[in-house]
């Protein structure tokens, strides 16, 4: 065979193989840049410390000195936030408002995990009794390090993860999310999560299903067993694999008219235990759960699910419609891992059952919120969530609503944003804590 014929033969062979591969691997979800696995290398890295004829050198580093790992940002979180931070309200992939809004203005992203900008929002107030109190930004969630976006952990409440040993100084986006995601769901029942085997063909966050030949990535690229960032030295590898959950494709949105339902399936609290191991309490035992609410697969809603479904707001437990009852302010885990079932559940508003369970994200947001400990609402003892039908705020027309213990240094608009845009009419005129969604009794109201 002459060289020209050989070249033609090789080209034809490559085209045939390419067509076969395309026919084997299903089309990827168009809105999923990471596609469940590793994205395009040059989105995060630069080969020669430059891009578009501009150097990547930042933050007064000597010209020619590159960022670690040839990243486009000064560090791991900065590189993530290059794409995931922005000022456009409810921009689908944004999880941090940037620039951070000034005092009196609110972060604009409304993803289920919350807006990291709250880590830079400090609230101060004086109570009706004259006591000065505050809620510093560092208390509002997971304190990531990002030099380019001014997120630092030196003011964090904890030097290590509460209930664990993970060092706060090493906290970044990739502490939880594997940027080169190796973790893949191998079957439609999500019974097997592996790091090798079938190639990842799409995201595992939106309901794509594995096939006989391909897998899908883990939920939100979360790391699994033995995962830790390459930059972290020490014995900090994860024990548990990623949770199984499915999000709707439209999730960064106001919930003023309807809830955004992430169908949490299985393993969320057990995964959180990778860093917060001693906080794990998955059985209801007063001697071991004092100060820590039970959560995890065994913390079933058996005794409270009827209250959850009947509850509309404080004092109103009249819902009897079995297709209603769900609230994304108090989500639950379903205790299942079937991907198709979970995908269908993202469109439902039905409430809980006896086999569902409490999880960490029932009360907390994964990233950050307007409240201490990244809770979904103001959980301070004795705090009303509405006063005389209005949200509390420093600008409230109601004197009690102005009081610091209720307003917590926020305007009424800021407060409403922290409730994901819900109008106060969704709640009772004097709304107690949303602990009542499960525990509608005086003992648990405050």
Predicted stretch roles:
Residues 2-4, 29-32:
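Generic start-of-chain signal for non-secretory N-termini
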Residues 21-30:
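C-terminal segment of classical bacterial N-terminal signal peptides
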Residues 1-11:
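N-terminal secretory signal peptides that target proteins for export/translocation
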């Amino acid at each position: 065979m002459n060289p020209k014929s050989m070249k033609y033969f090789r080209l034809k062979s490559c085209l045939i193989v390419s067509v076969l591969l395309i026919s084997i691997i299903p089309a990827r979800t168009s809105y999923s840049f990471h596609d469940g696995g590793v994205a395009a290398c040059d989105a995060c890295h630069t080969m020669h410390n430059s891009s578009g004829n501009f150097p990547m050198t930042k933050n007064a580093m000597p010209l020619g000195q590159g960022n670690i790992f040839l990243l486009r940002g000064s560090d791991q979180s900065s590189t993530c936030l290059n794409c995931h931070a922005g000022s456009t309200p409810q921009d689908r992939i944004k999880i941090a408002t940037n620039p951070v809004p000034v005092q009196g203005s609110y972060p604009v992203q409304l993803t289920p995990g919350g807006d990291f900008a709250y880590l830079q929002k400090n609230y101060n107030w004086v109570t009706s009794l004259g006591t000065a109190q505050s809620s510093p930004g560092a208390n509002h969630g997971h304190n990531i390090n990002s030099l380019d976006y001014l997120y630092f952990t030196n003011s964090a409440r904890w030097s290590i993860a509460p209930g664990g040993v993970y060092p706060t100084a090493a906290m970044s986006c990739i502490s939880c999310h594997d940027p080169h995601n190796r973790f893949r769901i191998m079957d439609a029942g999500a019974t097997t999560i592996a790091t090798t085997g079938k190639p990842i063909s799409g995201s595992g966050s939106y309901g794509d299903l594995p096939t006989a030949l391909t897998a899908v990535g883990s939920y939100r690229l979360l790391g699994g067993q033995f995962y830790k960032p390459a930059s972290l030295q020490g014995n900090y590898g994860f024990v548990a694999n990623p949770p199984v959950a499915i999000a709707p494709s439209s999730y960064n949105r106001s919930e003023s008219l309807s809830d955004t339902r992430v169908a949490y399936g299985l393993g969320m609290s057990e995964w959180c235990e990778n860093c917060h191991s001693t906080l794990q309490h998955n059985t209801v035992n007063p001697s071991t759960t004092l100060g820590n609410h039970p959560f995890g697969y065994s913390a079933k809603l058996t005794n409270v699910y009827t209250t959850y479904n009947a509850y509309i707001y404080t004092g109103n437990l009249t819902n009897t419609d079995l297709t209603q009852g769900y609230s994304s302010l108090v989500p639950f885990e379903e205790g299942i891992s079937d991907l198709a079932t979970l995908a269908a559940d993202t469109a439902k508003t039905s409430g809980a059952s006896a086999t569902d369970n409490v999880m960490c994200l029932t009360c907390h947001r994964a990233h950050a919120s307007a409240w201490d400990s990244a809770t979904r609402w103001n959980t301070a003892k004795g705090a009303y969530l509405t006063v005389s039908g209005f949200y509390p705020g420093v600008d409230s027309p109601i004197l009690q609503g102005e009081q610091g213990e209720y307003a917590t240094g926020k305007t009424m608009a800021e407060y409403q944003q922290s409730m994901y845009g819900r109008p106060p009419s969704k709640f009772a005129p004097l709304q107690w804590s949303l602990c009542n969604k499960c525990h509608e009794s005086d003992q648990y109201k405050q």
